[in-house]
UniProtKB/Swiss-Prot annotation:
Gene Ontology molecular functions: structural constituent of ribosome
Keywords tagged on the record: Acetylation, Cytoplasm, Ribonucleoprotein, Ribosomal protein
This protein's name: Small ribosomal subunit protein eS1
UniProt keyword annotation of Transport present: no
Assembly behavior: Component of the small ribosomal subunit. Mature ribosomes consist of a small (40S) and a large (60S) subunit. The 40S subunit contains about 33 different proteins and 1 molecule of RNA (18S). The 60S subunit contains about 49 different proteins and 3 molecules of RNA (25S, 5.8S and 5S).
Residues that bear N-acetylalanine: A2
Family: Belongs to the eukaryotic ribosomal protein eS1 family.
Length: 256
């Protein structure tokens, strides 16, 4: 008779348990700081495994993208329908210095805008900012009832929609190409470009709910620590940034 190993009889001693190691003992927390473009700079915290040997924690944090609600950054629920993406570019002690990486609408807001009896106009353009960031900017708009209109629907003709789309692309191209990334962020928060499109297309067809619904970063220039530090001010640990006014105006330099 062949003799084999009886698994039932070869169990270890009763009462001995495997030692459980808390995984958080090997991790450390870092504070995420938003640029001074936003009113509240303290975004939150993130964690990563501690530096061991040749493996540096800072290398794993650089390039990490964090999504934050704009209402938290501005301290106002009026901006709750927009999400901002921030990218970690530099690690200073326990602070992570971030830069703007994109903006988007929440899905519930986007769905609430689409209704019956009106035309939807969408346009997008790929453009380079004044400081060499390549962005793809998406705009959305809807037709609205004209004064004293009796007709139920507000559909626009295809020729009118083409004119509106062309005007939207022209305005987006102009506004983005003449601004740095920080200046563009200041325009996006109070919806300056959307209001400009709405005003410029009044002669073609009246519009409503005109928004820059999404900005996507395609390519960024070579990393410059000086530019990043200027975005975060001299004190990178400050909790408050600059308040963006709702009536943003471009600074016009007088000719010398």
């Amino acid at each position: 008779m062949a003799v084999g190993k009886n698994k039932r009889l070869s169990k270890g001693k009763k009462g001995l348990k495997k030692r459980v190691v808390d995984p958080f003992t090997r991790k450390e927390w870092f504070d995420i700081k938003a640029p001074t473009t936003f009113e509240n700079r303290a975004v939150g915290k993130t964690l990563i495994n501690k530096s061991t040997g040749l493996k540096n924690a800072a290398d794993g944090l650089k390039g990490r993208v964090i999504e934050v609600n704009l209402a938290d950054l501005q301290g106002s629920e009026d901006h709750a329908y927009r999400k901002v993406k921030l990218r970690v570019d530099e690690v200073q002690g326990k602070n992570l210095l971030t830069n703007f990486h994109g903006i988007d609408f929440t899905s519930d807001k986007l769905r609430s805008l689409v209704r019956k009896w009106q035309s939807l106009v969408e346009a997008n353009v790929t453009v380079k900012t004044a400081d060499d960031y390549y962005l793809r900017v998406f705009a959305i708009a809807f037709t609205k009832r004209q004064p004293n209109q009796v007709k139920k629907t507000t559909y626009a003709q295809s020729s009118k929609l083409r004119e509106i789309r062309k005007k939207m692309m022209e305005i987006m191209q102009r506004e983005v190409s003449n601004s740095t990334l920080a200046q563009l962020t200041q325009k996006l928060i109070p919806e300056v470009i959307g209001r400009e499109i709405e005003k410029s297309t009044q002669t073609i067809f009246p519009l409503q709910n005109v928004h820059i619904r999404k900005v996507k970063l395609l390519k960024q220039p070579k990393f410059d620590l000086g530019n990043l530090m200027s975005l975060h001010g001299e004190g990178a640990s400050e909790e408050k940034g600059k308040k963006v006014s709702s009536g943003f105006k471009d600074v016009v330099l007088e000719s010398v």
